[in-house]
């Protein structure tokens, strides 16, 4: 077998010997019959003076016969063609070596980097990088792939950031693709055209036309190069159109129909409002129209600015409607604003709970002594000094009664508590004692419903007269000036419904009353509890606004020195006053957002039913009284059971 291979190699060498004697004019013949392909490659490399590397996957035999002779260059191309027939390709390496590989692996093994000065010839495997100037590489690459033979070696890829094509394949095929690229990558017939608009807005028309072009691309898959590009110049109210001649002609024809003067007929509309107040919207819409006039005034010619100046907005309070006179574009924008403002505003039910509990007690106890010869032990803070009491008793014994002239008259009239004693001879003793216990429970639950961002107030109380001044006239007549102060429960609230279910509440809460325990001669004393703040509360939740926990304790002792300190006996020489009070005050708030009629109706029915039940319980409690309860008024049970009337149509 080894001898046979040697014979075959010798025959191949003989067949591939040059037919002429001069190297520069060497002619080669090629006749192979069932020759080993690897040995064939080695022999060709020897005659071409090339180092050829053979991939291990290259195996098999070849058979070819040629009746012509070739030059060295023709012989090399013949060598490449033979390998191509058997599914192999030759790659030129950077160091000048040749490498024989399977054609299927050529896509992952780029060939010699060729250019216009060294493009490669024939079946030589090359790679060309072609930059494009006028055509997007992304659009051209798929077309070039279709022009390559289905079974040919090579590939076409694009790199979009640099807008280049990377071509790999046989030099003959790549050179043909280069010719195609040169013919396609040329500056088209695009030109720029400026169209000045007389009536329409350049920005508005540019937006409309670009939208039409975009939609036509989506439906017909029209290439971007064949369509027009439109840019608006706001300063000159012009459109700059670039693109092919036919595309520009279509846009120009369309602009002739769009850039026309708007008709002034039928530009007055009446908008009937459902929720908003017409008089309140006039100022808002006037501001919007002025803004539109400022934005578009500079973009329009003087001949077309008159329509913008003739904007009139009037409110009709009787029908709660708006009468607007303006051109079509302004009408559409104002109609959009009206639709967003004329909406049903949310309402808020605000319920406040004021709880106050007061508990106090006091004890006043004292003993006073008096002697005509020695002196007295007197405590004036008891409200009944012993000297005044002794003088009153003496006048009583002398006159047989007590009159307003008696010095003890005023003291005994204003004194609260027990007073006991005796006045006999030179001695007198007076015992005063008073125990007090005060309790006060207050529970107020004011509630009110108001619109979003609308101030609402609630006031339940009395007007109490307060003496503010007194003047004596020339005829000794006294002229008094009286002011009235409202006491009771006051609630002021402004709700603001935020995104979601949160409510911002600005609250002023006051609970006031007249202090009945005060004995001031200057006028009544008022108890006032006031809170003013802003809170953010979620709908339906009860939160505390503020509160006060007050614990008051006071003890006062008046005594005779030394004698008052004697155990037990010292009680006869002292006056003791003890006072203690506790007060707990808390204020709560609960908002409920009302967005529709069903929620409002449900809340109203709940409160109506609760108060009716309380009223019914009171009437039932009076059924056994002497006065009959059958004629007492009571809330109707079926008020919320009847259907609400149908809304009237305008």
From Swiss-Prot:
UniProt cross-references to PROSITE patterns, sorted A to Z: T2SP_D (PS00875)
Keywords (A to Z) from UniProt: Cell outer membrane, Membrane, Protein transport, Signal, Transmembrane, Transmembrane beta strand, Transport
Presence of keyword Kinase: no
Taxonomy, superkingdom: Bacteria
Keyword Transmembrane recorded: yes
GO BP: any one term: protein secretion by the type II secretion system
Sites annotated May serve as a pivot that allows opening of the central gate for substrate egress: 461
Chain residue ranges for the region called Secretin: 345-596
Subcellular location: Cell outer membrane
Region (S domain): 598-650
Region (N2): 189-263
Signal peptide: 1-23
An MF annotation (GO) of this entry: identical protein binding
UniProt-annotated stretches for the region N3: 266-342
Pfam families cross-referenced by the UniProt entry: Secretin, Secretin_N, type_II_gspD_N0
Region (N0) location: 24-122
Assembly behavior: Forms a cylindrical channel with 15 subunits; approximately 25% of the particles have 16-subunit channels. Closed pentadeacameric channels are 180 Angstroms long and 145 Angstroms in diameter. Each subunit turns in a clock-wise manner around the channel.
NCBIfam families referenced in this protein's UniProt entry, alphabetically: type_II_gspD
Role, per record: Involved in a type II secretion system (T2SS, formerly general secretion pathway, GSP) for the export of folded proteins across the outer membrane. This subunit would form the outer membrane channel.
Family the UniProt entry places it in: Belongs to the bacterial secretin family. GSP D subfamily.
Domains: entry comment: The N0, N1, N2 and N3 domains are periplasmic, while the secretin and S domains form a channel that is partially inserted in the outer membrane. The N1, N2 and N3 domains each form a periplasmic ring; the N0 domain was present but not resolved by electron microscopy. The secretin domain forms a double beta-barrel structure; the outer barrel has a diameter of about 110 Angstroms while the inner barrel forms the central gate with a small pore in the closed state.
Note: Part of a cryptic operon that encodes proteins involved in type II secretion machinery in other organisms, but is not expressed in strain K12.
Annotated protein name in UniProt: Putative secretin GspD
Organism name: Escherichia coli (strain K12)
Lineage: Bacteria, Pseudomonadati, Pseudomonadota, Gammaproteobacteria, Enterobacterales
């Amino acid at each position: 077998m080894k001898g046979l291979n040697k014979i075959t190699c010798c025959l191949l060498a003989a067949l591939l010997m040059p037919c002429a004697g001069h190297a520069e004019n060497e002619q080669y013949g090629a006749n192979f019959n069932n020759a080993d392909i690897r040995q064939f490659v080695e022999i060709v490399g020897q005659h071409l003076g090339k180092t050829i590397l053979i991939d291990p996957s290259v195996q098999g035999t070849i058979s070819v016969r040629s009746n012509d002779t070739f030059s060295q260059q023709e012989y090399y191309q013949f060598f490449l063609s033979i390998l191509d027939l058997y599914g192999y390709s030759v790659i030129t390496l950077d160091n000048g070596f040749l490498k024989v590989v399977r054609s299927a692996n050529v896509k992952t093994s780029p060939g010699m980097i060729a250019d216009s000065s060294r493009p490669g010839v024939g079946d030589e495997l090359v790679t060309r990088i072609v930059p494009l100037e006028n055509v997007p590489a992304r659009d051209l690459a798929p077309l070039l792939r279709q022009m390559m033979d289905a079974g040919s070696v090579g590939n076409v890829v694009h790199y979009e950031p640099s807008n280049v094509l990377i071509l790999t394949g046989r030099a003959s095929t790549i050179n043909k693709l280069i010719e195609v690229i040169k013919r396609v990558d040329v500056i088209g017939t695009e030109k720029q055209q400026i169209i000045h608009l007389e009536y329409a807005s350049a920005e508005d028309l540019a937006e409309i036309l670009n939208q039409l072009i975009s939609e036509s691309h989506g439906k017909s898959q029209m290439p971007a190069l064949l369509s027009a590009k439109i840019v608006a110049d706001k300063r000159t109210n012009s459109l700059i159109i670039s693109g092919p001649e036919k595309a520009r002609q279509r846009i120009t024809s369309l602009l002739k129909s769009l850039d026309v003067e708007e008709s002034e007929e039928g530009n007055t509309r009446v908008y009937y409002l459902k929720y908003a107040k017409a008089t309140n919207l006039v100022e808002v819409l006037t501001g919007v129209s002025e803004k539109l006039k400022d934005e578009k005034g500079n973009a329009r010619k003087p001949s077309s600015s008159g329509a913008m100046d003739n904007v009139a907005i009037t409110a009709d309070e009787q029908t709660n409607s708006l009468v607007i006179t303006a051109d079509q574009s302004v009408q559409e924008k104002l109609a959009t604003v009206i639709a967003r403002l004329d909406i049903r505003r949310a309402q808020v039910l605000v319920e406040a709970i004021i709880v106050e509990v007061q508990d106090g007690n006091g004890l006043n106890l004292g003993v006073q002594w008096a002697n005509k010869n020695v002196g007295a032990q007197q405590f004036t803070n008891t409200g009944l000094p012993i000297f005044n009491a002794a003088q009153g008793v003496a006048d009583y014994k002398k006159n047989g009664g007590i009159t307003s002239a008696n010095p003890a008259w005023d003291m005994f009239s204003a004194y609260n508590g027990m007073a006991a004693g005796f006045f006999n001879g030179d001695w007198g003793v007076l015992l005063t004692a008073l125990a007090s216990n005060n309790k006060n429970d207050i529970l107020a639950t004011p509630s009110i419903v108001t619109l979003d961002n609308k101030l609402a107030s609630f006031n339940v109380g009395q007007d109490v007269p307060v003496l503010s001044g007194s003047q004596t006239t020339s005829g000794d007549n006294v002229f008094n000036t009286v002011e009235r102060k409202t006491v009771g429960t006051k609630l002021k609230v402004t709700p603001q419904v935020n995104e979601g279910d949160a409510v911002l509440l600005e609250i002023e809460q006051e609970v006031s009353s007249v202090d009945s325990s005060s004995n001031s001669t200057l006028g009544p004393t008022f108890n006032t509890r006031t809170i003013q703040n802003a809170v953010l509360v979620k709908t339906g939740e009860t939160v505390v606004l503020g509160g006060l926990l007050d614990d008051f304790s006071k003890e006062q002792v008046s005594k005779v020195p030394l004698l008052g300190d004697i155990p037990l006996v010292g009680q006869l020489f002292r006056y003791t006053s003890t006072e203690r009070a506790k007060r707990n005050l808390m204020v709560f708030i609960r908002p409920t957002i009302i967005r529709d009629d069903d929620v409002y109706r449900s809340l109203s029915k709940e409160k109506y039913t609760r108060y009716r039940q309380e009223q019914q319980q009171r009437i039932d409690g009076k059924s056994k009284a002497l006065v009959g309860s059958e004629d007492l008024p009571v809330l109707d049970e079926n008020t919320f059971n009847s259907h609400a009337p149908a809304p009237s149509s305008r």
